[in-house]
């Protein structure tokens, strides 16, 4: 089997400038992110560090070292009973879309989540205001359906951006049958490093 055109690895704080440049268009020119302002570099570094304390924060890197996108899981709701759930986030460079990268990111995220004893993944997805919405399409909704997520609810007109209201759709994917007595969630940094490396390698193929 030939080597993949990119590899997955864990994000570092040094990746923050490149990742912020990937994220910025989704803030400034789209309603995919509901942030109004692009966060500062220091704030973005803080987010990477905070998420990485418990969850995987992944980047995709091509053969030239250019970052193509990033993905992570993070806290769903900050109460102990929700610990076996996580919310997923993926952002791709604009020219890296439509090449199967998002699907491979989810392949990695799902397997790493199971290794952590996380069984439910949730995605929070903005809904476009009709087919002619220049700030948002239904691509993310259709992508998550393709990945096995099921739409379970909608927050009606809960987001206001670019002078219009947006619905926020929630989608869910159950990764396995829930055990009657689940093992505690394992913080991502405590996972076996060889296992993580193997998952990242296989997911990029």
Task: Please name every model-derived segment.
Residues 20-47:
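Conserved GNAT-fold acetyl-CoA-binding loop/helix
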Residues 113-136:
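Conserved GNAT acetyl-CoA-binding A-motif
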Residues 98-115, 137-142:
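Conserved acetyl-CoA-binding loop-helix of GNAT-fold acetyltransferases
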Residues 157-205:
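C-terminal "cap" of GNAT-fold acetyltransferases
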Residues 89-98, 125-130:
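A short, internal acetyl-CoA/4′-phosphopantetheine-binding micro-motif in the GNAT/acyltransferase core
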Residues 7-19:
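A short beta-loop-alpha structural element at the N-terminal edge
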Residues 38-85, 89-95, 107, 112, ...:
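Acetyl-CoA-dependent GNAT
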Residues 72, 124-126, 141, 145-164, ...:
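Conserved catalytic-core motifs of GNAT/GCN5-like acyltransferases
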């Amino acid at each position: 089997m030939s080597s993949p055109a990119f590899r997955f690895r864990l994000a570092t704080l040094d990746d923050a400038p490149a990742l912020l440049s990937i994220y910025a268009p989704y803030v400034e020119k789209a309603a995919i992110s509901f942030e109004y302002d692009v966060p500062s570099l220091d704030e973005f570094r803080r987010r990477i560090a905070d998420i990485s304390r418990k969850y995987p924060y992944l980047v995709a890197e091509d053969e030239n070292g250019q970052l193509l996108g990033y993905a992570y899981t993070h806290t769903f709701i900050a109460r102990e009973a929700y610990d076996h759930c996580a919310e997923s986030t993926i952002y791709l460079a604009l020219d890296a879309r439509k090449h199967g990268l998002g699907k491979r990111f989810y392949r990695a995220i799902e397997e790493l989540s199971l290794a952590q004893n996380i069984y439910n993944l949730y995605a929070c997805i903005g809904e476009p205001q009709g087919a002619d919405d220049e700030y948002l399409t239904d691509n993310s909704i259709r992508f998550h359906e393709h990945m096995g997520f099921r739409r379970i609810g909608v927050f009606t007109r809960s987001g206001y951006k670019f002078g219009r209201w947006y619905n926020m759709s929630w989608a869910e994917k159950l990764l396995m049958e829930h055990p009657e007595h689940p093992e505690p969630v394992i913080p991502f940094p405590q996972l076996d490093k060889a296992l993580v490396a193997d998952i990242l390698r296989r997911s990029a193929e």
